[in-house]
Amino acid sequence: MFKVGIIFLLTYSYTAALIINGYVDMHFGNLAHAYQDYGVAYCFTSSIKDRGIGKSKEYSQEYRDNLKLDLDETSIEVSEKTPNIIFVQLESFFDPKLVKGVEFSYNPTPNFDRLREEYSSGYLSVPCFGAGTANTEFEVQTGVNLDDFGPGEYPYRTVMQSKTCESAAYDLKKIGYSTHAIHNNDATFYDRYKVFSHLGYDTFTPIEYMSSDYQKTPLGWAKDKMLVPEIRKTLDSTENMDYIFTISVQGHGDYPAVMPEGYIPSVKVSGFFAEDEQTQFEYYVNQIHEMDSFIGELVNMLERRREETVLVMYGDHLPTFSFTNDTMENADIYQTEYFIWSNFDMEKIDMNLQAYQLSAAVFERLGISEGYIMKFHQTKHKDEDYLKKLKILEYDILYGDKQIYNGEVPYVATDLKMGIEDITIDQVYNYKDYICISGNNFNDFSKVLINDKEVDCEIISGNLIKVPKKNVVSKDEVSVVQSGEDKIELGRTTYKVE
């Protein structure tokens, strides 16, 4: 054991020296692949040695004052237009026709192709490959460059656990928007149920607060078409304009090496460069074909509404296959694509963007310039020292003296409401040898507690739950709790029996 400890310390010291002197790669687009390529010792060392954003030599009072003054005196043309703004991050979505040599029985992404051609679009450079959804969404929401963090770091699991950060949601709240997040997967994944209050959201609707009437893929992921009614419901929940950040899940890996029993793919695929991944890729293509149908359904729903709306859709990263730059027509495995749709006239302007530039670019098109990071991207992206200044600004906001805000962070964590529709209990009564709980918006993630002890229950409908072989008595407290498989309580409604 002593020898193992000595070996570890020597390895740690050696790899730390390599990191400090810049002899090894510091960018982990896929942490699992990094462990394979560089080994446990290097990845572990770099992950604990280099976390957060490093302090630049230029980080001085004078430099910060000049940067603040420059941004305060810089502006873009502001508009009075305040449409609904909806971002949809599509899990592992990209155009599979970009893979060299692959043939399809028919086009798997006709809706995405049409919208990309008719509306503003371009390539989107993302910080991850094959995994790391939360890092792409962090860049998109905050405008912060993940390259400035430690290798393999997830800010959701480090700095965002305890701090607020300037974000698109906070910026839009300043001008009267209601802010919402939606995700058709577990609320606790990447700690979103904690982090979203630090990013300025009023509500968060994870799958634990959605209707149980949804379909799953053969591997158990929720299908994305369930997001259409959830987005519509969210838009209907307020009378003012809404900002909705939506994270989809259907395209999530891993993908099966053998087609699931009874599953018949509608799109046939041939010519994939890695023969041992051919079946997996065909399965994946059929999932994004269904996601493409969801894109069409969402646009159709928004077209029918009378409210002016902007919809931004993009892929978070490429799926986990043996892609290299050489296998791709666009020669970059860290690129997905985006488009900006609207139900009112917007000039088509195509440009390639970094994920951390996307929100600022959309807001600039709408004449919205709130927040220092967004304004910085809108006005300084052509500067020679753009990335250096961005890193200094990020450090000041998250780790430094907050000089850009005159020393005091203006963003307070929100009282995050789980779900759009309240889960209520109207009545609890005995019927024969079971308890009936009537109310609203129960689903498959609803659990029943009697006097704080969980009991078996049967979800009959969104309005009725049965508890078998039990009766309640006066002063019993009956609670309906929402939680996923990890048993973390997300919300509770309690009824006291008279």
Regions found by a protein language model. Give the residues of each.
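Long, solvent-exposed extracytoplasmic domains/loops
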Residues: I85-Q89
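Solvent-exposed soluble domains appended to multi-pass membrane proteins
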Residues: T74-E80, L90, D95-V467, N471-E498
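N-terminal secretory/membrane-targeting segments
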Residues: M1-P83, F104-Y123, T158-S162, E166, ...
